Amino acid sequence: MNKEERAKRQSKIRNFSIIAHIDHGKSTLADRILEKTNALTQREMKAQLLDSMDLERERGITIKLNAVQLNYKAKDGEEYILHLIDTPGHVDFTYEVSRSLAACEGAILVVDAAQGIEAQTLANVYLALDNNLEILPVINKIDLPSADPERVRQEVEDVIGLDASEAVLASAKAGIGIEEILEQIVEKVPAPAGDSEEPLQCMIFDSLYDPYRGVIAYIRVVNGTVKVGDKVRMMATGKEFEVTEVGVFTPKTTQRDELTVGDVGFLAASIKNVGDTRVGDTITHAKRPAAEPLAGYRKLNPMVFCGLYPIDSARYNDLRDALEKLELNDSALEFEPETSQALGFGFRCGFLGLLHMEIIQERIEREFKIDLITTAPSVIYKVYLTNGEDVIVDNPSNMPDPQSIDRVEEPFVKASIMVPNDYVGAVMEICQGKRGTFIDMQYLDETRVTLTYEIPLSEIVYDFFDQLKSNTKGYASFDYELIGYKPSKLVKMDILLNNEQVDALSFIVHRDSAYDRGKVIVEKLKELIPRQQFEVPIQATIGNKVVARSTIKAMRKNVLAKCYGGDISRKRKLLDKQKESKKRMKSVGSVEVPQEAFMAVLKMDDN
């Protein structure tokens, strides 16, 4: 293409994404848009088409972002090229959303006509506003009996401050209002800025590993043009490659000769090493590089850590490969090797949140067929020692000796919880139980309230979300952001089995709840660990002080079975002999800890 053709094509491109709270109908709307623009034949169409991972379909949530190029003939008779970038709605995957938004000029904000605005809706809108996107509100599910589009329209204006007078009333399920949405995209979303003659700048917003073609980078071209055969350079790592193919997703991968300004597509360049394409990096030409890289994304720091160990220790290297491949298209995952006396060799992994942790675990078990043991999740603590040094602890077993600790600080989050009036009491009770500090309470309208609390991250990590949902019948929605570290009275609790410490069961707990926690865990382990031939004491200790103890009674053989009647001294002799053997056994015996026991420590608050 020459310069004029490229400029004309550029003026017809519209890049947009769809943002919404979980379950407000984002993926269904994406399906309808694909149908409307005839991107697929009826035969290829299936529900939640862009959720390509089995896991996404099963849980009905979007985890990864996805990009598609569509052609749309508008009412003004012109052909437009639309790039739809689908985004997840769950709080753990906010980084996926911020990556999608950085590649767009506009966003469709989907709000459920019955539920109204929820916490994640707001969080994602603020992300979109930070990226200066044109936001088009769409009120979805208007065919529900409980829908109240006018109230929701008012809410969008009051809470977010967007003009909702032209908001499209739609039902993605019934296919109502889809054309109006497409027309609004064409009219209101600006065409991409940028110059096809400038030095090349492409932003990598995702990547995948293909065993035959190497690493495939998903890119958005900001300036310049990239063709097959070009020599390109990754600006963060400085590595150079020759482009072997470029193309777009129509959801299938379709090869093209070149990608130019505003295009969203993929680029392969026989990149073998997973670490060479970092998400957020800029690709430029090796001969005529751009002066500076694009502003990427903030690198998201993991907030929750846990140990992953293969049940079969021979599969340690397979687990490393699995984690490396997942890290490639999940830039927020971090891991490093660690060893545990109880569990052998494994990895300490960092995640954004509990859902993220569960999903990664499940993907490893499914896609790579590796059975895992996971240890209790923990957060990063800052420990200040009496000698003036400070250390960072992400694994309870690395906690320094209590005598040498001056103070411990833990991360706090600011949690905003949107909840119907009737459940305010229940939510406040949960937050107080989790050591939360009340900050603020605002009424959105007559029926809904936003509560703001400061809560330690370690309390949210366990099962805060589950408790919140179950005590509000699923109506509460929740969003959190890290606000920093504050000192807390924290202690490390160790579990001793048969007087030996099991490092994988250690955890860090607030001093006030240490006794209760210890008591519950000891009782729980007593139920889960099978009886042995000798008696096994289970102790919960803080430093050298035992705070809770329970004993698993020994199984014993009836050694008197052969003595009919018989002399008491004969019986005594047999019983004493048995006692001696048990004692000897106890000093050399070791106790196997079943996988359920590790899980029990996580699911502490069930009772």
From Swiss-Prot:
One of its GO terms (biological process) is positive regulation of translation. GO terms for molecular function: GTP binding; GTPase activity; ribosome binding; translation elongation factor activity. It is found in: Cell membrane. GO terms for cellular component: plasma membrane. It catalyses: GTP + H2O = GDP + phosphate + H(+). The keyword Cell wall biogenesis/degradation does not apply. The keyword GTP-binding applies. Its EC number is 3.6.5.n1. Keywords: Cell membrane, GTP-binding, Hydrolase, Membrane, Nucleotide-binding, Protein biosynthesis. Residues 11-193 form the tr-type G domain. It comes from the Bacteria. InterPro entries: EF-4, EFG_III/V, EFG_V-like, EFTu-like_2, G_TR_CS, LepA_C_sf, LepA_CTD, LepA_IV. GTP binds at D23, H24, G25, K26, S27, T28, N140, K141, I142, D143. It is a peripheral membrane protein. Belongs to the TRAFAC class translation factor GTPase superfamily. Classic translation factor GTPase family. LepA subfamily. Required for accurate and efficient protein synthesis under certain stress conditions. May act as a fidelity factor of the translation reaction, by catalyzing a one-codon backward translocation of tRNAs on improperly translocated ribosomes. Back-translocation proceeds from a post-translocation (POST) complex to a pre-translocation (PRE) complex, thus giving elongation factor G a second chance to translocate the tRNAs correctly. Binds to ribosomes in a GTP-dependent manner. This is Elongation factor 4.
